[in-house]
Amino acid sequence: YPPKPENPGEDAPPEELARYYTALRHYINLITRQRY
């Protein structure tokens, strides 16, 4: 599996959080696509 994106933390700037959630969604898509 690809490495899980790092959680930037509660006090991260909004663009940092947005990038994290985008990466996380992409990561989940990769994993679910591989599994099924």
Swiss-Prot record:
Subcellular location(s) per record: Secreted
InterPro entries according to UniProt: Pancreatic_hormone-like (IPR001955), Pancreatic_hormone-like_CS (IPR020392)
Modified residues (Tyrosine amide): Y36
Record GO biological process: feeding behavior; neuropeptide signaling pathway
Predominant subcellular localization, coarse grouping: secreted
Similarity field: Belongs to the NPY family.
PANTHER family: NEUROPEPTIDE Y/PANCREATIC HORMONE/PEPTIDE YY (PTHR10533), PEPTIDE YY-RELATED (PTHR10533:SF14)
Full protein name: Peptide YY-like
